[in-house]
Design a protein with these regions (language model features):
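Extracellular beta-strand-rich, repetitive "passenger/adhesive" scaffolds
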Residues: 120-127, 146, 513-517
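Right-handed parallel beta-helix
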Residues: 114, 119, 139-150, 168-182, ...
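Acidic Gly/Asp/Thr-rich repetitive segments characteristic of extracellular carbohydrate-active
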Residues: 42-94, 517
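Extracellular calcium-associated, cysteine-rich motifs in secreted modular proteins
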Residues: 476-543
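Extracellular beta-strand/beta-solenoid scaffold signature
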Residues: 129-134, 155-164, 179-204, 220-231, ...
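Extracellular beta-strand-rich solenoid/capping regions of secreted or surface-exposed proteins
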Residues: 83-90, 102-116, 127-144, 150-167
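Extracellular beta-rich repeat passengers
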Residues: 1-12, 16-22, 253, 258-477
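N-terminal pre-domain segments of enzymes
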Residues: 1-64
């Protein structure tokens, strides 16, 4: 936990504990954290569905004293900045009345619990966070419609685009993340450091990541990785993983792992893998679409490879391409990465290396591989060196899904593909060009790269793939896919600076000259500021 950030937030955290708003750093089980009796927002699902976020919790039944922070500055720090809001203490709701790039000079550390970040409230083209990462090292966090595009290329400081050591009651919704230098996203455990005692690494609990994009990790150090995620009481639903070499995602915690209705495109040598002998995997109705880098033999020429891929794509012969050209599994013995759904891992200690968890793997589509689509256990589950598919099934297969907090509407894999491409990521206030080109590349089966794309030259780069791998979708520099667009927007009129624009307040019978009404609780259980940030139609209309 970051010392400076903690010292800054601690007075409010301590005061909150005396007021019935606890900080629970020792949490290790889903039941250790109290949850709300209403959803974090309409449409919230899974383990993080009942996060308190910026509304806060009160065990003493006293009035909740939440605060609204309005981001009006794109600076790294100071009044009106995102850092000021995130690194404060106490329950808080963060809204935006500025559009553009927030370029961080150092990471933002969110250490105090009870925060909601509403990226959908930014005017115009919205906001994007670049330069450094935003670390969530606490509990009861809601983050929606926010773009994280770190983009820094100093390999001595290889951080993710977003993530952290989350404690629990966390939900990410409709976020877009790219250009990380380790993973694009990490969220699976936290560290409980007791005074003069060994640190405990504990699972993140009650976590949901839904409707998000994790794409284009920067491959400057063989680490263009998608995500390391996990936790207890988890749900990862309707997300897109695209153009990452590995960890799409990596299951970084034991226990339940519920991965439903996601789309995975253009991985190189790893799709989903991880877990251990205590894992219970639900891998349900996801859509896997190999791309030009999937199974790529790094000794081959990129230009010849992409030419062969384009030819096969045009003729509808990608099955033949993957079974004859990629160098992956073509000897008929080793299973191919091109149709891998899951590579489960065995026990983590020397004493249980022959022990495996259990997996319910069903309804997943692997494009171009009809046999694996018909029966996901016909090559789609690939643990290391334990025999053929019958042996694998006898050790790992569960015939029924494990109980979990499932989405209200579990779609088929084909329905997931259509839904995800139409809806995923920070689509409000509007989808930016970075996401648009990623999505179009998935549709086309051909990742986009800029006409003026050039090899990134760095004395610190260490890679297995060729320098021009951007032609296959694996980049080392954001400029290879067009770079960061300009985000424009005009601030809304908010006379009392309570985070709710005058026109919205008038339309909802509130007083635009009264700054206290934003945090007033309504009969719905939500504060007025929450009703505002959840009014997505208002933001879609460009108001």
């Amino acid at each position: 936990m970051n010392g400076a950030a903690w010292q800054k937030a601690m007075p409010d955290v301590v005061r909150g504990m005396f007021e019935g708003k606890p900080f629970v750093p020792q949490c290790s089980k889903p039941c250790d954290l109290k949850q709300a009796n209403i959803p974090a927002f309409p449409g919230a699902e899974g383990g993080g569905m009942y996060s308190f976020g910026g509304r806060g919790v009160n065990y003493l039944c006293a009035p909740v004293s939440s605060k609204v922070y309005v981001v009006t500055s794109l600076a790294d720090s100071g009044p009106g900045t995102l850092r000021e809001a995130c690194e404060a203490g106490g329950p808080r709701v963060v809204v935006f009345n500025v559009a553009g790039e927030i370029k961080l000079k150092r990471p933002i550390n969110i250490v105090a619990p009870y925060i909601t970040i509403a990226g959908q409230t930014a005017p115009g083209d919205g906001i994007v966070i670049t330069g450094e990462t935003m670390l969530v090292d606490t509990h009861d966090v809601i983050i929606r419609y926010t773009r994280f595009r770190r983009g820094a290329m100093d390999v001595a400081h290889r951080d993710d685009a977003c993530g952290g050591n989350g404690i629990g009651n966390i939900i990410y919704d409709h976020c877009s993340a790219s250009w990380g230098l380790d993973e694009v996203m990490s969220m699976y455990r936290h560290v409980y450091a007791r005074h003069n005692k060994k640190q405990d690494k504990l699972p993140t609990v009650n976590i949901t990541i839904q409707d998000c994009i994790f794409a284009h990790g920067l491959d400057l150090y063989n680490h263009a990785f998608g995500a390391s995620i996990g936790g207890h009481n988890s749900l990862f639903a309707r997300n897109l993983f695209a153009n990452n070499i590995s960890r799409n995602p990596s299951i970084a915690m034991n226990g339940d792992f519920n991965f439903v209705n996601n789309v995975i495109f253009n991985w190189w040598n790893r799709s989903i893998d991880g877990g251990d002998n205590l894992s219970e995997y639900n891998i349900i109705n996801n859509y896997f679409k190999p791309g030009p880098v999937t199974g790529f033999d790094q000794t081959k020429n990129v230009d010849k490879t992409i030419a062969a891929y384009r030819k096969a794509l045009k003729k509808g012969r990608l099955y033949v391409y993957y079974t004859s050209e990629t160098g992956s599994g073509k000897d008929g013995k080793a299973p191919s990465i091109c149709y891998r759904i899951l590579k489960p891992e065995h026990g983590r200690s020397k004493d249980n290396q022959n022990a495996w968890g259990k997996a319910y793997v069903s309804g997943n589509v692997v494009e171009y591989f009809d046999n694996v689509t018909r029966d996901n256990w016909d090559g789609g589950v690939q643990p290391a060196d334990i025999g053929g598919k019958d042996r694998i099934a006898s050790l790992l297969k569960s015939d029924k899904p494990f109980a979990y907090n499932k989405p209200q509407n579990v779609m088929s894999a084909a329905e997931s593909y259509a839904y995800v491409l139409d809806n995923v990521g920070a689509t409000i206030p509007r989808r930016d060009n970075v996401d648009a080109t990623i999505i179009q590349g998935v549709r086309d089966g051909l990742p986009y790269y800029a006409k003026d794309a050039a090899v990134h030259v760095s004395p610190y780069s260490k890679r297995r793939l060729p320098d021009n791998s951007y032609k296959l979708g694996i980049i080392t520099d954001p400029q290879q896919t067009g770079g960061l667009p300009i985000y424009n927007g005009t601030p809304r009129t908010d006379t009392d600076n309570d985070g709710m624009p005058d026109d919205w307040e008038k339309a909802h019978a509130l007083n635009p000259a009264d700054p206290t009404d934003a945090t007033a609780l309504t009969p719905s259980g939500y504060m007025n500021i929450e009703l505002y940030i959840n009014d997505l139609e208002y933001f879609k209309a460009g108001k």
